[in-house]
Amino acid sequence: KLGVGLAGKIVAPTVPFKPLFFMEDALKFRAAMPDFPFVYVGGVISRETADKAIENGFPMIQMGRAVLEDTDFVNKMKTDEKHCSGCEHSNFCIGRMYSKSMQCHKHCEDITPGLKKAVAQINAQNDKMERKLGYK
């Protein structure tokens, strides 16, 4: 707990989230190696973003945080075209994977009040940045 408290900003930095955040770079790889069956990784949070990745030539997609936050995410996305991940992109799960089981902060029973407060602050900062950048 002390380590996360001291190094939390390094492990779980405040970064504005953008759907399909690696698409621009991924398309450069696709252009350089058009016959290679790349898996798209990065910011697939809805049926719309999944479809965009596939339309851009990626035969497979990877979903991490969306499924970590809701293990039934793919089924919900199949039945509701507008369904979007409830992940708040606080990066808590990333920091946690190096010390404990990787979990979304929403589902952790052992999260401390201090970490809850830190996650809320990160979410507020991310939300502010995302609105400023026009991502929301």
Predicted regions and their residues:
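Flavin-dependent oxidoreductase catalytic cores
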Residues: K1-K136
